[in-house]
Curated annotation (Swiss-Prot):
Stored SUPFAM superfamilies: Nucleic acid-binding proteins, Translation proteins SH3-like domain
Domain of life: Bacteria
Family matches, as Pfam families: EFP, EFP_N, Elong-fact-P_C
Parts forming coiled coils: none
Record GO terms (molecular function): translation elongation factor activity
GO cellular component terms listed in the entry, alphabetical order: cytoplasm
Name of protein: Elongation factor P
Main location group: cytoplasm
Subcellular location: Cytoplasm
The keyword Cytoplasm is annotated on this UniProt entry: yes
Organism whose genome encodes this protein: Leifsonia xyli subsp. xyli (strain CTCB07)
Record keyword rRNA processing present: no
InterPro entries cross-referenced by the UniProt entry: Elong-fact-P_C, NA-bd_OB-fold, Rib_uL2_dom2, Transl_elong_fac_P/YeiP, Transl_elong_KOW-like, Transl_elong_P/YeiP_cen, Transl_elong_P/YeiP_CS, Transl_elongation_fac_P
Biological role stated in the UniProt entry: Involved in peptide bond synthesis. Stimulates efficient translation and peptide-bond synthesis on native or reconstituted 70S ribosomes in vitro. Probably functions indirectly by altering the affinity of the ribosome for aminoacyl-tRNA, thus increasing their reactivity as acceptors for peptidyl transferase.
Amino acid sequence: MASTADIKNGIVINIDGQLWSVIEFQHVKPGKGGAFVRTKLKNVTTGKTVDRTYNAGAKIDITNVDRRDYQYLYQDGADFVFMDTSDYDQITIPGPIVGDAANFMLENQNVTVALHEGSPLYVELPASVVLEITYTEPGLQGDRSTGGTKPATVQTGYQIQVPLFLETGTKVRVDTRTGDYLGRVND
């Protein structure tokens, strides 16, 4: 058993038989009273997010999670097929486990899969990916002076908000955690 001093972003803890990933944590030492740790946890199976507070020094059960490099191969119905880059074994991961990561995955892209006792928990992507805009309305001449945005569909089928001056065929960098446009990529 570990203590609250060992809490870090990304670790997985076991609470009442369910696995929770730490999204955020903050050690708080108020002027009056004892210190405590405020956490934001995400259930790795259901995706539910909760806030939980622990007294400083409380015991927690940190679960060992094996993170392995995989390559995304293709989508098979609602499932996604990945190949282990070390031994070339293929695994099929159901869509609900892949979750929102599917919006940003391209074929042959390297990802990290978190495994617990051989079962996939979730798919981790890089912080940002480069995607090509496959469709967006043309920007009007007078719209360039304003700081507005317009919807654009990227090659995975996901829709993002982009500045008005971008056109179909432009490559853009997208934040995989929020889905926000980060910038244009020049080839």
